[in-house]
Amino acid sequence: MYRLLAPAKINLFLQIIGNCLDGSGYHELVMVMQAVSLMDRLELIPRRDREIKVHCTNPAVPCDQRNLAYKAAALLQQHFPDRDGVEIFIEKRIPLGAGLAGGSTNAAAVLVGLDLLWQLGLTQGELQTLAAQLGADVPFCLQGGTALALGRGEQLTPLADLQGLTVILGKYRSLSVATPWAYQTYRQEFAATYAQTPSEQEKARQEGGSAILLQAIQQHDIAPLAANLRNDLEKVVLPRYPLVAELKEQFLAAGAIASMMSGSGPTVFALAPSADEGYRIMQRVRRALPDPDLDLWVCECCPHGIQLETS
């Protein structure tokens, strides 16, 4: 039996360059991803048959073949058909449909856990290759920390960690944004601005502002980091979901050094220089927005990906 901790992720930077030139239908992206200390907890127990069973504390999570944790186990079973099944228990703390990679981080945890449980001896590179088959965010969730992600998100470069920086998360429980809708709507509205050739895409990458952010991360310089956050998907999500736009404004009004929507939303994150200030900001936002449907968390930037839970 293995217990694992699976961190959520936020996007500090999300630039849509254009369509991938391989004809896959995906977008070419420049992202800076950050793991945070809001974590799901997974427990993997071996079975004596070939079945994969998933259980979750959140009844809204599908526990069948639609679940990414299930898909991760099934993928490993395809590669290692002599292995038995597994019972997967997910204690869900990361909200659903939130732009926080909750499903992807569960899949990454299953890859790590089954590598140990089944004594597969997979290298980090082999785990990353499997992760990329499951979804664009799964390779990052495996690695965690702070990383530059190119392509669909699978081309990862580790960056200096941002330990000590506090992150406040806010999400309306009843609100979710479908990631495919966000990207498809962006394509419909902004396709005319897409970089069409390799040279155009490289130029867009160079001019998109990520270099300033990367330098700020390297130097742990919070002011230019906060000033150079970017999420292109805000252009389509915020007009459609005014609650998300208002939450971002309230974080800034409460004293956050920066605030932005994460991924395709609807989660909004804010940055604070300390945990004490993070809790003060959370309390101010709670007073300004007393809606019981709004969940708020204070967490830290996390320097790692999937970890074994030590008792």
UniProtKB/Swiss-Prot annotation:
Residues annotated as catalytic: K9, D137
Recorded superkingdom: Bacteria
InterPro entries xref list: GHMP_kinase_C_dom (IPR013750), GHMP_kinase_C_sf (IPR036554), GHMP_kinase_N_dom (IPR006204), IspE (IPR004424), Ribosomal_Su5_D2-typ_SF (IPR020568), Ribsml_uS5_D2-typ_fold_subgr (IPR014721)
Key words, A-Z: ATP-binding, Isoprene biosynthesis, Kinase, Nucleotide-binding, Transferase
Gene3D superfamilies: 3.30.230.10, GHMP kinase, C-terminal domain
Any one GO molecular-function label of the UniProt entry: ATP binding
Enzyme class, spelled out: transferase
UniProt pathway: Isoprenoid biosynthesis; isopentenyl diphosphate biosynthesis via DXP pathway; isopentenyl diphosphate from 1-deoxy-D-xylulose 5-phosphate: step 3/6
Catalysis performed (reactions): 4-CDP-2-C-methyl-D-erythritol + ATP = 4-CDP-2-C-methyl-D-erythritol 2-phosphate + ADP + H(+)
Enzyme nomenclature, EC number: 2.7.1.148
Task of the protein: Catalyzes the phosphorylation of the position 2 hydroxy group of 4-diphosphocytidyl-2C-methyl-D-erythritol.
Annotated protein name in UniProt: 4-diphosphocytidyl-2-C-methyl-D-erythritol kinase
